[in-house]
Amino acid sequence: MNLSPSRTPICAALAAALLGAAALAPAHAAQRILQLSEDTTHSKPVSAASALRGTPLAKAGAADRVCEAGAKWLRVGFKQLKLAGYDSLVLTSSGGDKLVFEGQHWNQRSFTTRPLRGECVDIQPYFSQPDSAFQLDRYDYSTVALDKATVVVAGAGDICDTSGNACQGTSDLIVSINPTAVFTAGDNAYNSGTLSEYNSRYAPTWGRFKALTSPSPGNHDYSTTGAKGYFDYFNGSGNQTGPAGDRSKGYYSWDVGDWHFVSLNTMSGGTVAQAQIDWLKADLAANTKPCTAAYFHHPLLSRGSYSGYSQVKPFWDALYAAKADLVLVGHDHNYQRYGKMNPDKAAASDGIRQVLVGTGGRAFYGISGSHALLEASNDSTFGVLKLTLSATGYTGDFVPRAGSSYTDHFTGTCNKGSGNPPTQTLTLNSVRDVTVKSGGSRDNGATLYADGSDGGQVLRGLMAWNVSSAAGKTLTGAQVKLQVSDRSTGTYDLYRAGAAWTEANASYSGVSLGSKIGSVVPSATGAQSIALNAAGFSW
């Protein structure tokens, strides 16, 4: 850049608009996210040598690589991922997919990523902090194309009544469907959810697939203090944690295929405890799956014996912000399917579909009234909900007990797959800057600095940025912002540097000019910007 002899200090920053996820509160509770897979999926451990390069934790360096010949896609399992400061970890597949981890959402979690297409995945750390590290433990793969890979989940709420006849019939449906996973939407064993009731009513029927079941509690389960019977049955007598989560909380999450499922507890007080909301937001922030479902007992909206419960709106607020897809509930003893809605119960194309399936076996409650979003309902058929899930959407079927004829069928596309990711703006200050002069001297008092003593020398201001925090994102625009504190005349051109340099060794002759990026005329003090052209995007 040629500068006039007037004094012109300029400081530089780089602003880039990128596609990425907005930051949410980090997860603090250590937990392992269970991954259940499709029938056509295989799993292999990652050898210590390839995962860790012979060290306990992988640090910055060359990319690790996980490969499986013939695979259509892979999921990478992390035993540990800890990111400090602005460090990031980038996964890039041979099929062209990319997944970027940044922030502290995954600290103290072990988890499995969403699928990445291709036979190989490169894991590249961009670490500058000593505390950042990662450790792999396994990977899943399939020779079946991703759009053909499906998994089945089934369940219901309000299940085993005192007679047991109806829940025997709905449990037979689950056995016939043969799902990968089963959910319950609460009130699993009547009347009070005691361990005796679970053992005598639930265990002989729905207990046949207990090993596949991820439950949630209802108000009848809490008729026994602390839902002791519920937790003793699913976790084991006296065990604090287990398949039903920590008995002091009753909420947890798990993954199946390319779906993230969240089991929530609507019985944590008259209103949902803030601790559960904070946990939910952190859990959703750490989720890498393209599709999300949540299930709990009380509905936001109902047209049966109840009209809905405002206490669950904080759940909906968090789920809607995270682009969740399905909410599965019970409490009203009937079947109701709603169109996609926002937390204010208004129709929304990016909303969540609520399916109320309180048809597991308890005596029916009648449907009462209507709602613009109520798409299907029935109050006389015991049955279960069957969900066939893919990486982009779902198919739902209400399956009736033998001898009944009512059915329902619906489909949907996952919100994250049907919309654009949010735009994030990053501002990166220059990490190196120095002015070099054609006479051989240098000055780094500012990015560009000229005064009357330069004697007609030609000056070049060198600037560099660390853009690792933008790794893996899609760049939609970028500009260099210059802060002018003393205006000058003339036009100053911005080029790519033609050689590597440091502030200590930079020289006018040692750094040639590359492609021209743009120009600025600093004729006024304050901010001046140069939009990057194609020459400035290859970074």
Curated annotation (Swiss-Prot):
It is found in: Secreted. Residues 30-148, 430-539 form a propeptide. Residues 1-29 form the signal peptide. It comes from the Bacteria. Disulfide bonds: none annotated. GO terms for cellular component: extracellular region. It catalyses: a phosphate monoester + H2O = an alcohol + phosphate. It is an enzyme of class 3 (hydrolase). Its EC number is 3.1.3.1. The keyword Repeat does not apply. Keywords: Hydrolase, Secreted, Signal. GO terms for molecular function: acid phosphatase activity; alkaline phosphatase activity. It holds the Pfam family Metallophos. The C-terminal Pro-sequence may be required for translocation of the phosphatase across the outer membrane. This is Alkaline phosphatase. It comes from Lysobacter enzymogenes. The lineage of its organism: Bacteria, Pseudomonadati, Pseudomonadota, Gammaproteobacteria, Lysobacterales. The gene is phoA.
